Amino acid sequence: MSVNLSKNGAALQAAYKDVLDEKTKTDWALYTYEGNSNDIRLAETGDGGLEELVEELSSGKVMYAFCRVKDPNSGLPKFVLINWTGEGVKDARKGMCANHVSTMASFLKGAHVTINARAEEDVEPESIMEKVAKASGANYNFHKESNRGNEGPQGPVGSVYQKTNAMSEIKRVGKENFWAKAEKDEEERRIEEHRRANVEKDRLERERKEREQREAEERERRFRERSKEIDGHRKQQEEVEKQQTVPASQRSVNPREMFLQKERSLPESGSVSAQPEQFTASQQEEENIYQDATENQNIYEDTPQEDPVYETGVAEDSGMCARALYDYQAADDTEISFDPDDVIIQIEMIDDGWWRGVAPSGHFGMFPANYVELLE
């Protein structure tokens, strides 16, 4: 966007004319922007020359100064235009204001020397006056040569020495020390911030690694526990399947044979009368052994055509009872069959691995002990 000189045009023009007019004490005028806009306003005017002007330049602003000085060679008034861009101005603002320099030069026309400055060393009064002297040197020599024939005896050569302003010098040195200290402090601050940022970064990285390590260890622990649990279930299932598939005659402990041997060794009761031809030998032996129990409980009738049948309900006189955990199919007529959750009553623990009892179907026989759980 272009610079706006019309909003405060009257004040801008009046200050400019005061500097041009040798009859006024005002010998410098300073211009700047209103905030971040492109509107130019009058910042300050004064009559203290370059020494006073440079004290008003701000490191955080873009400013334009127009100053009247006296040519050290000819003593004639000369005009200096200073385009000031402080070191603290943002780069985007610098780029925008750079396009306004030519417009300001056209407005503050008549300058013999133009200076583009960014730091205090660019606007030292001695340096500016040297540039003014060099700019007017050719014209000055021309005028001197043209008037040399009319001059009388030459007097002492005048000196261009200017008395040092003590207060101005103190201020200048103080500002130099101030800015040097400020730059040093700023550099130390940046170094400290960078160090703190690195420390914080290292801390976060260390915490992240520790957290990831803990999570990995926890996952490994859970994995081992789960694997152990799965292996236990698998072994248990394999054992159950093995028990189901191996015939009773091939099991490592065959309590059924032991049971049959015990039955054969018992003496036959003489009170039992001869049975009809329908009774098998195994049924006769079984009835001889359990005659007393069956008579007391009245579980089955003395009919040779049917197998003994027992009540399946869990009554007070049902003896030891158990609930089936798995299904089991009898290998022969000396064993009983049952399904999961069936209740087996009148259990006798004849062996660590094999018991016998009455199944829900009413049949009495042996079954594997690890297929059931006892009921309280």
Curated annotation (Swiss-Prot):
Residues 317-376 form the SH3 domain. It is found in: Cytoplasm, Cytoskeleton; Cell projection, Lamellipodium; Cell projection, Ruffle; Cytoplasm, Cell cortex. Residues 202-288 are annotated as: Disordered. InterPro entries: ADF-H, ADF-H/Gelsolin-like_dom_sf, Drebrin-like_SH3, SH3-like_dom_sf, SH3_domain. It is a peripheral membrane protein. GO terms for biological process: neuron projection morphogenesis; positive regulation of axon extension; positive regulation of dendritic spine morphogenesis; postsynaptic actin cytoskeleton organization; regulation of actin filament polymerization. Residues 2-133 form the ADF-H domain. Residues 175-231 form a coiled coil. One of its GO terms (molecular function) is actin filament binding. Residues 268-283 have a biased composition (Polar residues). Transmembrane segments: none annotated. One of its GO terms (cellular component) is lamellipodium. Residues 202-242 have a biased composition (Basic and acidic residues). Gene3D superfamilies: Severin, SH3 Domains. SUPFAM superfamilies: Actin depolymerizing proteins, SH3-domain. Keywords: Actin-binding, Cell junction, Cell membrane, Cell projection, Coiled coil, Cytoplasm, Cytoplasmic vesicle, Cytoskeleton, Endosome, Golgi apparatus, Membrane, SH3 domain, Synapse, Transport. Adapter protein that binds F-actin and dynamin, and thereby plays a role in receptor-mediated endocytosis. Plays a role in the reorganization of the actin cytoskeleton, formation of cell projections, such as neurites, in neuron morphogenesis and synapse formation. Does not bind G-actin and promote actin polymerization by itself, but excerts its functions by interaction with other proteins. Required for the formation of organized podosome rosettes. Belongs to the ABP1 family. This is Drebrin-like protein B.
